[in-house]
Amino acid sequence: MNRRSLLALAAALPFAGAARAETAAAGRLVLHEAMASAHAKTRNVSVWLPPGYDASDARHPVLYMHDGQNLFDASTANFGEWGVDEHLTRLIAGDQVRAPIVVGVWNTDLRLREYLPSDLIAALPAEMRDEVQAIYGGPPLSVGYLRFLTDELKPFVDGTYRTLTGPEDTMISGSSMGGLISMQAVMKRPDVFSAAACLSTHWPLKVEGLEPGPRLDAWRERLVTAWTGVIAGGLPPVGTHRFYFDRGDETLDQFYGQFQTRIDGVFREAGYGPGRFQSLLFPGAQHNEASWNGRLDVPLTFLLSPRPTQTS
């Protein structure tokens, strides 16, 4: 894969707006258009309600997912959809997961900066920080994006839909840069989110110069040092929160293994065991929606393992 193709993959990488119904394979999909924020750019938000939502008074856990336009509907997706509604409808019918409300937070043209963890950038050596910020078009905007999620969007969702509002019932997930901000969300706001599923997490932050050799080795070592320090110092206490990571070994994912292995060690050294931490390799999987769709049952089951239903 050439440099231009890798860059294109990485860059696929816009208060309460008007709501309108969308089409879902099952359940009900509602689009809240142009949701304004004091902390982040205005964007659409899609909310998927599970089958049976309108026929009962049950309250539901909530899964927040980034890149919301790619989750449910191929007509709004840039590179194919995840099929979240299809996967969850089948898993719910088989009693494999709890029935969640899924909040799909659409990205904007500031996606890369909104998903770039500010703590990591602050921990980088100055020259690396400058290089990353030049690639991304400016400093991280993740603090404002997370404030939008926790201080504006979550109260709106909890006030509009029948949700279970506590952290034990609130999860977050994303892919690539969305994996980074999902992990950061649990670390920064463990009082809001109890679990994160991070697919094809984009640990290297950039794609330039990632061909094997001395430059990759030097970049990786300095970056892993920053990552491990930030993660070790920011993890919630063991026993209260959960983290899922995965990766393929093709296209952009081919660069993640050496990062992920080292970072997995930080979680294990902190005491995160199999019930609280999972890191999986899917051989042959690429860095795209088709691959994430193909294995989505695994992180969904990790996040939403069954427990008794609660009602109002």
Feature-to-residue mapping (PLM):
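N-terminal export signals
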Residues: S5-A21
